Amino acid sequence: MIVALMGCAVGPSFEEYLTTVKSAGGTNAQDCGVGRRSESDKIALACASDALAQNRSFIAVFERRGIDSQVFASVVGNERGELWRISWDSDVTGGAGGNPWPKRRIFRTVCERAWSDAIAKCINS
């Protein structure tokens, strides 16, 4: 008997990624929503920029254009003015479906708040 396992991904799921983002923002973080490369990007960006200017905790999630995988980048800020980019890649191996075990990964980076367009630069860093 031969048993084949195909399509088993390794690493954190998208749901686990969202849990990580929400946890980083804290219980009182304003949820600015998910921007999906459209008008919702502008709404989430405006919400996050407003929260940052008022030193409020927030989370904003943005879908990015991946070459061969699904990619999301979140900006998370807290009351102390700290700012992070937390991103998720559905397959860091660049397998484009060729790898039977895609490797999902979460990355966390500190962003500079000094920029006037800190949120946009953080998302695209």
PLM ranges: what are they?
Residues 13-34, 94-96, 122-124:
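Acidic (Asp/Glu-rich) sequence patches and key acidic residues
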Residues 69-125:
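Polybasic, proline/glycine-rich intrinsically disordered low-complexity segments
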Residues 9-10:
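Bacterial signal peptide processing site
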Residues 59-65, 87:
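Short beta-strand segments that buttress and anchor functional surface loops
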